Amino acid sequence: MANRIDLCDAADVAPGNALKVEAGDLTLAVFNVEGEFYVTDDACTHGPGSLSEGYIECDVVECNFHNGQFNIKTGAVVSPPCMIPVKTYKTVVENGRVLIETE
């Protein structure tokens, strides 16, 4: 059965922006892509960069450390030097709150 973790108010993340959120032992990036919300691990898989502090264009985030890029929706690597996809989470918005579902 999935557990839900409440992350933030949807109004805290403007379209085209991200917010770093700590929930328990997770450090996450909450993205608003044209009104749709997506959540990934905040840490880049290549180095110490924070994806919530990266440059966002459409559904791609560029890490602020080595400029590797990830698809925000799928976690897939878009450009090197990153080689490992970033973890994504099933995301829901309920009563104006952004939540993730975990196993």
Say what each PLM segment does.
Residues 58-64, 77-86:
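Short cysteine/histidine-rich metal-coordination sites, predominantly Zn2+-binding motifs
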Residues 1-58, 72, 85-103:
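N-terminal pre-ligand scaffold of iron-sulfur
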Residues 44, 63-66:
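Short cysteine clusters
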